[in-house]
């Protein structure tokens, strides 16, 4: 019996995959537990439509990420921070991914999720710093931060 897997089933198939499995296994386990459904021509057509829509959505997300990367990679795009600095040359407060995201939104009207900003630890130094941003699994940009003394 041919079935379309609705979820990943270890050792049998991945979501969206069409596979031939024993009839008893399909009827008594996969279909009963909503892990798969019978691969009729209508169900296969519906699956193809869903896959096309998903591909289109992924292409749009990728295009949007590339557009944001182009803005961030521009030399004029420098996020300005003015922080109080102690005698040792380190800032009193640290600059976190959340702060960077908020300032980017304020200064350049570019929305970047704070979880996409890759910071090993909060920034406490002054000067020009480049921070990587993972906009998409294929697109990585760099934000230039200019941290000055207030």
UniProtKB/Swiss-Prot annotation:
It comes from the Bacteria. InterPro entries: Ribosomal_bL9 (IPR000244), Ribosomal_bL9/RNase_H1_N (IPR009027), Ribosomal_bL9_bac/chp (IPR020594), Ribosomal_bL9_C (IPR020069), Ribosomal_bL9_C_sf (IPR036791), Ribosomal_bL9_N (IPR020070), Ribosomal_bL9_N_sf (IPR036935). It comes from Streptococcus equi subsp. zooepidemicus (strain MGCS10565). Disulfide bonds: none annotated. Binds to the 23S rRNA. This is Large ribosomal subunit protein bL9. GO terms for molecular function: rRNA binding; structural constituent of ribosome. It holds the Pfam family Ribosomal_L9_C. One of its GO terms (biological process) is translation. The keyword Disulfide bond does not apply. Belongs to the bacterial ribosomal protein bL9 family. Keywords: Ribonucleoprotein, Ribosomal protein, RNA-binding, rRNA-binding.
């Amino acid at each position: 019996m041919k079935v379309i897997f609705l979820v990943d089933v270890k050792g049998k198939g991945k979501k969206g995959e069409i596979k031939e499995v024993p009839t008893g296994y399909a009827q008594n386990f996969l279909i009963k537990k909503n892990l798969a459904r019978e691969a009729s021509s209508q169900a296969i057509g519906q699956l193809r439509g869903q896959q096309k829509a998903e591909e289109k959505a992924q292409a749009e997300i990728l295009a949007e990420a590339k557009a944001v990367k182009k803005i961030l990679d521009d030399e004029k795009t420098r996020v300005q921070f003015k922080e109080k600095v102690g005698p040792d040359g380190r800032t009193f407060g640290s600059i976190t991914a959340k702060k960077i995201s908020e300032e980017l939104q304020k200064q350049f009207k570019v929305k970047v999720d704070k979880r996409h900003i890759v910071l090993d630890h909060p920034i406490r130094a002054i000067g020009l710093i480049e921070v990587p941003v993972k906009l998409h699994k294929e697109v990585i940009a760099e934000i230039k931060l200019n941290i000055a003394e207030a």
